[in-house]
């Protein structure tokens, strides 16, 4: 079985995840930017719409948008960089991965700042929900795995032995996967929190703005599932290709 045959499922799952990404992004932008008032009762404010300023009571929608793009788009693309055979063959995968990771880190930092400012403005309580606790743990994992990989493969690469880089790389990959799925789970949990707040505030359960953020969470889950399939099939292709190369070397030796 040739490696090109095994790479076909990787490409399918990678592009499927990107389709889900685009749908998620469209729903996220629609929810955060378009919906700011309930369409049936203009006097009823809803949890959606960035009609206000950065630090106003409705400014926490920046948190939703920035964190959604950070983990739903940037982190997803950083993972998919290593599922691309062309990027890996040209040696660009590491740098594309690093670029998307840096973008995700900047967006996540801005998203954290926006929710702190918005909560301070509205005198809302901090750190009382499952979403908040999971968010802090996810960001801590993000920072650790980012600088771990940066030190191992960029800053101190020339000073580390190949064995050390391999060991550090193993932990970086493990932490990276954990961070990605922790981020997806935290985002989905955040959407669930919003849905409860929206319904509790009197907004209809099946209102268009309520459903927009609900389906955004669903497509974010679809995206992460497709990424998992892409990573799994990519690893399978690597193992089989390595096995074929070793068999070929043994045949030549014989």
Segments from the language model and where they lie:
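Membrane-embedded alpha-helical bundles that constitute the cytochrome b-like, heme-associated redox core
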Residues: 2-254
């Amino acid at each position: 079985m040739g490696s090109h045959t095994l790479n076909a499922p990787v490409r399918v799952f990678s592009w499927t995840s990107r389709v889900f990404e685009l749908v998620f992004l469209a729903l996220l932008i629609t929810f955060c930017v378009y919906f700011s008032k309930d369409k049936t009762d203009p006097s009823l404010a809803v949890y959606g719409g960035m009609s206000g300023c950065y630090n106003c009571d409705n400014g926490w929608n920046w948190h939703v948008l920035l964190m959604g793009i950070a983990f739903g788009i940037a982190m997803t693309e950083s993972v998919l960089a290593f599922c691309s055979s062309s990027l890996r063959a040209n040696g660009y995968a590491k740098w594309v991965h690093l670029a998307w990771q840096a973008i995700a880190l900047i967006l996540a930092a801005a998203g954290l700042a926006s929710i702190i400012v918005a909560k301070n403005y509205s005198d809302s309580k901090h750190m009382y929900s499952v979403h908040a606790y999971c968010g802090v743990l996810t960001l801590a994992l993000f920072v650790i795995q980012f600088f771990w990989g940066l030190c191992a493969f960029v800053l101190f690469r020339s000073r580390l032995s190949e064995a050390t880089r391999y060991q550090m790389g193993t932990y970086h990959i493990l932490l990276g996967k954990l961070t990605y799925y922790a981020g997806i789970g935290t985002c989905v949990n955040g959407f669930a929190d919003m849905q409860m707040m929206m319904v509790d505030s009197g907004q209809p359960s099946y209102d268009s703005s309520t459903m927009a953020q609900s389906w955004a969470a669903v497509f974010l889950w679809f995206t992460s599932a497709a990424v998992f399939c892409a990573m799994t099939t990519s690893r399978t292709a690597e193992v089989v290709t390595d096995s074929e190369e070793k068999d070929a070397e043994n045949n030549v030796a014989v």
